[in-house]
């Protein structure tokens, strides 16, 4: 009896040391699973996006819309734009490890549960564009880690909780278009939006809150309010003017001299710096970003020293910088900042990227505009890019590679399906996917992508991208769409599997110029181990590798219409619907092969996908890895 008892005791000690063990109830039920099932039961899910949430499961980390930490704790509930309705359950307060809650653009109704204040690790809360009503719970003031709070476009009423003044880390707040009243705490957030609330006001002007509705207040980037001075300040100004009235003439002369000096210095400095407050750029929607002076960024990067260069891209160099408070940043210095079209590109990026807030997208931190310079400031990603990490030692473990694939896919889903207008990246590659401190994927460099309003595609006379990642239709016609990004993402998946860039992989002696055909051949012959990064050794799951290769081949099909949407890609990477999609794609391939065989007998056909890949590989065989490409489209169709 003694050995079994000892083993049981040892097992108990080991299991209790696991972080996730604390989540188990006395009956061995995962408390996070219980909470999520209660949330699911109160929501109406017409499209079945939560069908993978199984109450009999002990591991919610494999569920759709759920993100977990390396310790298998639920840290993200992300179900934006999923047509969900019903109520948000108070059980959300039991998910105490949550860091991100994204439920925007649904039709969830009812009050915001007060239990949400128990999420002490929560950093991002987005409940915007739903039908929540009632008061904002005072427990929101307990979310001391909160950085982003969006409650806009609901029907919330009552005052904003005074306890929210405790939110010392809050960077961005959007309460616009509700029915809120009363003052906003003075030091709540660096940037916030309260327009569309008829009786909301500044904390310093509380006496005006319940009178006639004032005009919406405007805010500068540093949070200062516009408008007239309060009455007490006007009285002091009047007394000051009377007391010194006898010296008005002298003061006038001094002011005139000072004005002349200011004009002279301003005219001289215009050759170096551009005043962004001038009328000609007032139409820039600055969003949630900070304005830097050129000298600030020059000092932060040590004069844009070559030793601080993090990378070079088609739009300019990226420099490592350190702000006076010690914050590390990445500064992108755009090429030809004063050239024709440069300002329009800059405005596009500042306006659009500042509104694109997602855990898997690189957030724009600030900007700088001068007469000759355009610069963008981002948070510094300590783990670099996926491309650099794949070349480093030790090899990136397989589980991390899978997590990177899913994270990058979710970021692209947000750009394609949740931004209005949608954003097409046009250069999806490992070098443009960064890794944060937890090795989570963060997609960057999408700010200068072509934006589509509500059209399906865009035709341009210039093709920008990286050799090996450019979709065939984009290279040949200049026509880009969200399926162009899907193609690039498929190549990214192969980079994660092989540990090589597209050009490295395509130039090897065994399969030069026909990479995708060779990958498909290895997959069909069940030889995927030939593809796997040798640095992994045996540390990978063969079935998972086969599935990722299948998804990559689906994404890189020659015809854009046959490629899946990025939301479908996410589901397939999570194990939902891949088998059916692969079978259907195999049918397409068989039909295409039969058609090609017939056309060879009857005429000289246009080059198929394989020939295109081979020709592409030969044309650019002299290029180096990650070479950027900016060429004129071979043939343009449709309007330019």
From Swiss-Prot:
Residue spans, topological domain Extracellular: 23-241
This protein's GO CC annotations: plasma membrane
Membrane topology listed for this record: Single-pass membrane protein
LRR repeats: from-to residues: 95-119, 120-143, 145-167, 168-191
Name of encoding gene: SERL2
NADP among keywords: no
Cytoplasmic side: 263-640
Domain Protein kinase: 304-583
UniProt-annotated catalytic positions: 427 (proton acceptor)
Chain sites annotated for binding ATP: 310-318, 332
Top class in the EC scheme: transferase
Sequence intervals crossing the membrane: 242-262
Gene Ontology biological-process entries: defense response
Annotated EC: 2.7.11.1
Subcellular location: Cell membrane
Subunit field text: Interacts with MSBP1.
Keywords: ATP-binding, Cell membrane, Glycoprotein, Kinase, Leucine-rich repeat, Membrane, Nucleotide-binding, Plant defense, Receptor, Repeat, Serine/threonine-protein kinase, Signal, Transferase, Transmembrane, Transmembrane helix
This protein's name: LRR receptor kinase SERL2
InterPro entries: Kinase-like_dom_sf, LRR_dom_sf, LRR_N_plant-typ, LRR_R13L4/SHOC2-like, Prot_kinase_dom, Protein_kinase_ATP_BS, Ser-Thr/Tyr_kinase_cat_dom, Ser/Thr_kinase_AS
Signal peptide location: 1-22
One of the record's GO molecular function terms: protein serine/threonine kinase activity
Glycosylation sites: 94, 107, 153, 166, 179, 222
